[in-house]
Design a protein with these regions (language model features):
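C-terminal accessory "lid"/substrate-recognition subdomains
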Residues: 1-25, 194-292
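A transmembrane-helix-recognition feature enriched in membrane-embedded lipid enzymes
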Residues: 2-64
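Residue-level signal for inorganic ion chemistry
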Residues: 39, 79, 130, 172, ...
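Glycine-rich phosphate-binding P-loop
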Residues: 66-85
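N-terminal phosphate/diphosphate-binding loop that engages ATP/GTP or pyrophosphate donors
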Residues: 84-146
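Conserved beta-strand elements of the Class I
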Residues: 95-99, 187, 267-271
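Phosphate-binding/switch loop-helix module in NTP-utilizing enzymes
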Residues: 138-181
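Inter-motif core of Ras-like GTPase G domains
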Residues: 179-192, 213
C-alpha cells in the first residue's frame, strides 16, 4: 500500500465534514470555498515545482538545520516535538537554537530573542510557549536553548549562529518554509482520523498528501486508532508518537507547576488557539473533569 493511499483511507474516516449530508451548512461552506482551494492548490503546486526543478533555490545556513512541520493546520503535536527535540539534542551536547516564525507578531522583520518577559505581541504565542517549556524545569540544561522569533528564518538563523554559536537549528513549522535548506525534514501527521485531504480553505490541508514525499521522517501523532504503518512500502521511516498531560502551569506564574490530577472532578473551562483542537478536547476529557 502506498503512503498516499494509506493516509487517504485512514485520515478521512471521521473528519467533521464527513457528515456533510447531515449538515447542510457545512455542505454550503465547503462548496463555496472549493474554488478557492483549487486556486490555493495551483499556487502551492507551482511554488513546489519551482523548488523541485531548482529554479528557486533555498538559502544555506552555516549550521545543521532540522525542520519540524506538518501539512495540516495545527493539532498534530508539532510544538511538543520541537521542545522534545531541542531538549534531547542539547542534553547530548549540541548547541541548539529554535527558530520560530512569530506569526501575527511584531517580529515579522526583526529578530527577537525570546525571554520570559517578552510580550507575546512582539514574539508570537508559539515562540513564547516554546521558550517557557524549555525553561520550565530549573534542573534542565535546556534552559540555555535560545528561541529566536522572526518570519525570516534565514535571518534569525544567522543571528543564532553568530550570537550563540548554534550548531543545530530547529525550525518550528518549517515544512512549507522552503526558502531555507535543511538537513532533515520531520513531518507530523494527525492519525486520529480528524482531517479530510482537502486543501485550504475548504479543508484543513496546507499541502496535498503527495508533498509527504519531501519528508525524511514521518511521525504519526497519537496513533491509537490507526492501523500499523510497519508494512507500508515507502522510503521514509514512519514513527508513532503519543502525548499525555503531565502538569499544569498557571498563566500568571509560568514557572510554578500544578499536579495534573487537579482537573479530575473539577469544572473546567478550556480554550485554545490550535487549528484542529479535537485532540486537546479529548485529552482534557480523559482527565475526568466534572464539567468541561
Amino acid at each position: 500500500m502506498s503512503i498516499r493511499l494509506f493516509l487517504e483511507q485512514s485520515i478521512t474516516r471521521s473528519y467533521p465534514f464527513s457528515n456533510w449530508w447531515k449538515n447542510g451548512i457545512s455542505v454550503v461552506i465547503c462548496i463555496l470555498f472549493t474554488p478557492f482551494s483549487w486556486l490555493y492548490s495551483l499556487v502551492v503546486s507551482s511554488r513546489n515545482t519551482l523548488y523541485d526543478l531548482g529554479w528557486l533555490k533555498p538559502k544555506i545556513l552555516p549550521s545543521q538545520v532540522i525542520s519540524v512541520g506538518n501539512i495540516t493546520v495545527g493539532g498534530t503535536g508539532k510544538t511538543p516535538h520541537v521542545v522534545y527535540l531541542a531538549k534531547f539534542l542539547h542534553q547530548k551536547g549540541f548547541r541548539v537554537a529554535v527558530l520560530a516564525a512569530g506569526y501575527r507578531s511584531k517580529s515579522n522583520k526583526q529578530v527577537v530573542v525570546v525571554s520570559n518577559d517578552t510580550p507575546v505581541s512582539v514574539c508570537g504565542d508559539e515562540a513564547l510557549m516554546i521558550y517557557r517549556q524549555l525553561t520550565a524545569d530549573q534542573s534542565q540544561k535546556s534552559r540555555n536553548v535560545p528561541v529566536l522569533s522572526c518570519r525570516n528564518r534565514y535571518k534569525s538563523g544567522l543571528q543564532a549562529v553568530s550570537q550563540f554559536g548554534s550548531e543545530v537549528l530547529i525550525v518550528d513549522d518549517g515544512f512549507q518554509h522552503r526558502q531555507l535548506e535543511r538537513m532533515i525534514d520531520i513531518v507530523l501527521i494527525k492519525s486520529e482520523n480528524q482531517l479530510a485531504p482537502k486543501l485550504l480553505p475548504a479543508g484543513a490541508f496546507r499541502e496535498p498528501l503527495s508533498s509527504l514525499g519531501r519528508a525524511d521522517i514521518i511521525i504519526q501523532s497519537s496513533p491509537t486508532k490507526l492501523e500499523s504503518a510497519d508494512n507500508l512500502n515507502i522510503n521514509q521511516p514512519v514513527f508513532n508518537s503519543y502525548y499525555r498531560a503531565t502538569r499544569l502551569y498557571p498563566i500568571h506564574e509560568p514557572n510554578r507547576q500544578i499536579g495534573i490530577d487537579e482537573i479530575s472532578g473539577a469544572r473546567v473551562f478550556a480554550f485554545c488557539g490550535i487549528g484542529n483542537p479535537s485532540g486537546f478536547s479529548k485529552l482534557l476529557q480523559s482527565l475526568d473533569p466534572a464539567d468541561l
